[in-house]
């Protein structure tokens, strides 16, 4: 019997190398083979294509494209038939990022120069396949409301028929379904009926509901092609807590956290609607028809287009009340017309709380680590069709929207992160959309909830063209974002040397520090970038100040004018009241956040509470000569000539540059009694200056106190006061003085120093 050869190799013979069959000859053959194996792992379990927006049903390990499971939502896995609730749907963000990296690597290995590696491949292919797929599902999460939202869209390939000009055109039917638990009052008439009597009455048929809602019956003159077309154009509205309708009958399923009612108005013309985002695809045929028939519009801004018979087109009166949050323009039972916020086709709202599942837990991650934003916004109906057909614009519209804007109004609506359309376009690198939004009056200096501006986003993602475009439209180059990071911090941190050069040429400050005291040069190891950032500054502060004045002058003068006097005599108060009538302004007796102008009698600012609050809020602090000049000319004069110099001017420029407040990063503890400056007034000043109040006296010898790594933003760079963030304030106008403390992060400071800092709008040095 022959001996079995040993399974281990001897030390003289090297172990066999795993066989790797190269896909093609030439360079990187093994990498191509490995990429081919990776491609097999990134395929959908149903369509066997590369995953597009991968999702899992939660009950099994199979992963599908979002468009492949539209008919399986809420039923089960199409492969292993494992039951799955609709709330178990999860988007695999990590796998989506891996697919995008795979696509970029494939383009590099195969020398595919035609494709743009910067574009989002999965999203671009999704729009390309939208006309070949009938159903697509979209899920995303709202970290703030801890809810999931799901939209199943049915995209029609064939061209939408135009509505006939006569009054016999087909209209959509509106049906209403009310859930059994909890009982919901549907209309004004239904409020009079008792809830117990609802059980005695049988369910109403669809035809009866249509008759009660004064809907016209369907005629044989309809120009729709098939019965299925009629099903797709029915609008179904639900109340509060609801059951889910079949996704095959309704084109869109929307799981909102609000659980409110939305009724969508259907019109035969698709000329002007709220643009759908991402998979709400507007076909080119539909867009072309909107150009041919611009007079046919959906009800917008409390008015409806009038048809040939004198009746409003597309304005039904369903017998349900709508939620204020949804803001629908559908007429209610009382006859009110409300503005629609969603598309006029197949909208179904379902409350997540009605579905049989536990509390939804959603992981909230940092925005900059996410691959794409969860919620985006829609453009106004006045967007030109050429921009709608642009692929980059469609990539910007990557998620379903809850915003509808009328034409000519800047897109000021935000998603749950506070991002506007300009933020989304800057993140995605959509140059055409950024240019369009800026030309239509969008503010380039708007901040989201974290403090980022569109310039921050463009610098962080390396979009040089968008950075130049924003700077051309007077974007502030030194404004701070999250943790007081400037755009130069973001550009240096991500190694974008071209953007660093552009920012420096527009006056970006090299010495700007964030909340941790780090400059832009501290965030990069690249020698070419460090050499640029280590150059001495010359006129950066002057250039940025001049830029901010030019940017905000027009915006400031277009706003309301609110006046308040400080230290004025009775005669001066009468003249100020007269100026109120001349300029159609408002005069306040007490200071609030709406005040724009503080009038003082002479060339020095008053140390009154009104004047100091005006300084801290960046108001115009003007001499009384401005009032006389305005009364003489009977119009508003330029404020710059009459502004009190020093602290008031520095504060106003600081506000126009959107920089942090005076006491940003500082903490205060008020110890002892305060008589000359009341404690309540000091608390108001500290809060208005961005400082924080400590309820306990800080301990200088505490390791926790001394290890705080934040700095004061407005302290001088070469001063040790920058690292002092906790102040113990005492009253120093009396003979009794507490023991002085000046140890590390904790310093003792008199109340007069606090007042002097406010008047000068700078952190003055403390005497040792």
Curated annotation (Swiss-Prot):
Localization of this protein: Nucleus; Cytoplasm
ANK repeats, residue ranges: 417-449, 450-482, 483-515, 516-536
A GO cellular-component term linked to this record: BRCA1-B complex
Numbered residues of crosslink Glycyl lysine isopeptide (Lys-Gly) (interchain with G-Cter in SUMO2): 154, 413, 538
Pathway(s): Protein modification; protein ubiquitination
Domain BRCT, chain residue ranges per copy: 551-644, 658-768
Chain positions found as Phosphothreonine: 383
Any one Gene Ontology BP term: regulation of phosphorylation
Region (Required for BRCA1 binding): 20-113
Modified positions (Phosphoserine) in chain numbering: 380
Record-linked Gene3D superfamilies: Ankyrin repeat-containing domain, BRCT domain, Zinc/RING finger domain, C3HC4 (zinc finger)
Residue ranges, annotated region (Disordered): 1-20, 188-226, 307-334, 370-414
EC supergroup of this enzyme: transferase
Post-translational modification: Processed during apoptosis. The homodimer is more susceptible to proteolytic cleavage than the BARD1/BRCA1 heterodimer.
GO molecular function: protein heterodimerization activity; protein homodimerization activity; RNA binding; transferase activity; zinc ion binding
Comp. bias (Low complexity): 373-391
Bias-annotated ranges (Polar residues): 319-332, 392-405
Compositionally biased region (Basic and acidic residues): 209-226
Keywords for the protein's UniProt record, in alphabetical order: ANK repeat, Cytoplasm, DNA damage, DNA repair, Isopeptide bond, Metal-binding, Nucleus, Phosphoprotein, Repeat, Transferase, Ubl conjugation, Ubl conjugation pathway, Zinc, Zinc-finger
Transferase as UniProt keyword: yes
Compositional bias segments (type: Basic residues): 197-206
Reactions it catalyzes: S-ubiquitinyl-[E2 ubiquitin-conjugating enzyme]-L-cysteine + [acceptor protein]-L-lysine = [E2 ubiquitin-conjugating enzyme]-L-cysteine + N(6)-ubiquitinyl-[acceptor protein]-L-lysine
Zinc finger extent (RING-type): 44-81
PANTHER family: ANKYRIN REPEAT DOMAIN-CONTAINING PROTEIN 39-RELATED, BRCA1-ASSOCIATED RING DOMAIN PROTEIN 1
Role, per record: E3 ubiquitin-protein ligase. The BRCA1-BARD1 heterodimer specifically mediates the formation of 'Lys-6'-linked polyubiquitin chains and coordinates a diverse range of cellular pathways such as DNA damage repair, ubiquitination and transcriptional regulation to maintain genomic stability. Plays a central role in the control of the cell cycle in response to DNA damage. Acts by mediating ubiquitin E3 ligase activity that is required for its tumor suppressor function. Also forms a heterodimer with CSTF1/CSTF-50 to modulate mRNA processing and RNAP II stability by inhibiting pre-mRNA 3' cleavage.
Protein name: BRCA1-associated RING domain protein 1
Species assigned in the record: Rattus norvegicus (Rat)
Gene transcribed to yield this protein: Bard1
